[in-house]
Amino acid sequence: MSKTPLSIVHPWHGPVLTRDDYESLCCYIEITPSDSVKFELDKETGLLKVDRPQKFSNFCPCLYGLLPKTYCGDLSGEYSGQQSNRDNIKGDGDPLDICVLTEKNITQGNILLQARPIGGIRILDSGEADDKIIAVLEDDLVYGAMEDISDCPGSVLDMIQHYFLTYKATPESLIQAKPAKIEIIGLYGKKEAQKVIRLAHEDYCNLFM
């Protein structure tokens, strides 16, 4: 009896991003709020790898991962620059990041889930576009009814923004008030998030298809 070799779908290239014009999204989760290690997808192998231990006391306050078949390239960078009033902004060359809100205690990464985008955070990281889409887990009992970022509690948005402002900072840089590499330009709602996702999807198609 012959054995058929198993093939693993690459989380970045395999799953279908959306079937309904970016209303519902397939998301690949890399990090959970309980992780004391920063995991990230190895783009070459499709395996989840250890990027680095979390060195300081900040933990990601939500599920965090990427959107399959997205890439922050020329279109994403140009649009971010336009919306930020900055010149020569490029995409960061990675899949588009996503934060997923849920009241459930999901403690395992390296999973796929369906979520609905409600908005996003426009971020520049060392002068590169590095937006974070904010979404809610489909049918979540607490967050599932939210339609737009205006429905999300401000305290939740504050925690997410604080994490991204500080997760790369050292105590020394904070004490000495050194200029931050991470700059939050602002928040945006669902329609803008869908446009950011569409441009990142087009960047992916231009690069890989």
UniProtKB/Swiss-Prot annotation:
Name the keywords, alphabetized: Cytoplasm, Hydrolase, Magnesium, Metal-binding
Q: What does the entry list as the binding residues for Mg(2+) 1?
A: D92, D97, D130
One record GO biological process: phosphate-containing compound metabolic process
Q: Which cofactor does it need?
A: Mg(2+)
Catalysed reactions, as listed in the record: diphosphate + H2O = 2 phosphate + H(+)
Broadest EC class assigned to this enzyme: hydrolase
Give me the residues that bind Mg(2+) 2, please: D97
Task: Summarize where substrate binds, as residue positions.
Answer: K38, R52, Y64, Y167
Q: Does the UniProt entry include the keyword RNA-binding?
A: no
| PROSITE patterns given in the database record | PPASE
Q: Name one GO cellular component term.
A: cytoplasm
InterPro entries assigned to the protein according to its UniProt record, in alphabetical order: Pyrophosphatase (IPR008162), Pyrophosphatase_sf (IPR036649)
Q: Which family does it belong to?
A: Belongs to the PPase family.
Q: Describe its function.
A: Catalyzes the hydrolysis of inorganic pyrophosphate (PPi) forming two phosphate ions.
How is the subunit organization of this protein annotated in UniProt?
Homohexamer.
Query: Per its record, how is this protein called by name?
Result: Inorganic pyrophosphatase
Q: Which organism is it from?
A: Chlamydia muridarum (strain MoPn / Nigg)
Supply the source organism's classification: Bacteria, Pseudomonadati, Chlamydiota, Chlamydiia, Chlamydiales
